[in-house]
Regions:
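Active-site neighborhood of glycoside hydrolase catalytic domains
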Residues: 1-32, 92
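Residue-level detector of flexible, active-site-proximal loop/helix-junction positions
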Residues: 16, 25, 38-39, 162, ...
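Aromatic- and acid-rich polysaccharide-binding/catalytic face
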Residues: 21-58, 93-103
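Substrate-binding clefts and catalytic carboxylate motifs of secreted carbohydrate-active enzymes
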Residues: 52-196
C-alpha cells in the first residue's frame, strides 16, 4: 500500500520529497525519519547514535541471530514491523528526527490530579520537578541532535501544544504560554558547532 501511495504522490508532483511514514517502518521514502522520547540526554544520544549508526539497537533476537542489529526502524519495534524486509538507512538521503522531547509539564493543580492517572494527563518519562529542570532537559535533548548535524539534517520537537490528555506541549491547550518563550526560542535557535 505505502509503495503505491509513494508512487502516486510522485506522479502527481515529482518535484517534492515524499515521506511514506513518520518515525520508522519506512517502505519507500525520500526522507528518512526517526522518533525518540528518551528523557535523559546521555541515554538519548546512545539510542540515536549507537555504535556509529543512526538509531539502531540490538535486536531482541541478538543472541540467537549471531549478533545482528535491527534495521533502522526508528522507534517502532520488530513486533510492530513484522516480517516485511524493510530498507535500512544507508546515509544517502536526508535524515530528519521528526519527533523528540515530549516533556510533560502542566500546572501544579493538574499535576496533582493526574498523579498515577495517564488517562488524565501524561507525557514521556518523569515530569521535571522544576521549570529549570524542564529547560535543562529540553536543551540537553536538543543539543544531542545538534551535535549530530553531520548526519541529521532536521528535527521537530513534540509537541507545540497540549492535546487532550497529552500534557507535553510548549503551550497549554488554550494556546497560552507555559514557559518563558525567550528561553524556548534560545534553545531552538542554537546553531550546530560545525555550522559556525
Amino acid at each position: 500500500f505505502m509503495e503505491d501511495v509513494y508512487a502516486l504522490t510522485k506522479q502527481l508532483d515529482p518535484t517534492r520529497p515524499v515521506s511514506s511514514a513518520s518515525g520508522g517502518v519506512l517502505v519507500r521514502t525520500d526522507i528518512w525519519t526517526g522518533h525518540g522520547y528518551e528523557q535523559n540526554p546521555e541515554k538519548f544520544r546512545k539510542i540515536v547514535w549507537n555504535d556509529g549508526k543512526l538509531f539502531t539497537y540490538r535486536s531482541r533476537y541478538y543472541e540467537s541471530t549471531g549478533g545482528l542489529y535491527t534495521k533502522n526502524y526508528g522507534f517502532n519495534r520488530e513486533a510492530i514491523a513484522g516480517t516485511y524486509d524493510y530498507p535500512e538507512y544507508d546515509g544517502k538521503m536526508p535524515y530528519v528526527f521528526d519527533e523528540y522531547g515530549g516533556i510533560k509539564w502542566t500546572n501544579e493543580e493538574d499535576m496533582k490530579a493526574a498523579a498515577n492517572n495517564q488517562g488524565v494527563s501524561w507525557g514521556y518519562g518523569n515530569s521535571p520537578r522544576s521549570l529549570e529542570e524542564f529547560y535543562t532537559r529540553l536543551e540537553g535533548l536538543t543539543d544531542v541532535l545538534l551535535s549530530l548535524s553531520d548526519y541529521i539534517c532536521g528535527y521537530c520537537y513534540t509537541q507545540l501544544t497540549d492535546v487532550e490528555q497529552e500534557q507535553n506541549g510548549l503551550y497549554y491547550y488554550d494556546r497560552s504560554e507555559k514557559f518563558d518563550m525567550e528561553r524556548i526560542h534560545a534553545v531552538f535557535s542554537k546553531v550546530p558547532e560545525n555550522y559556525k
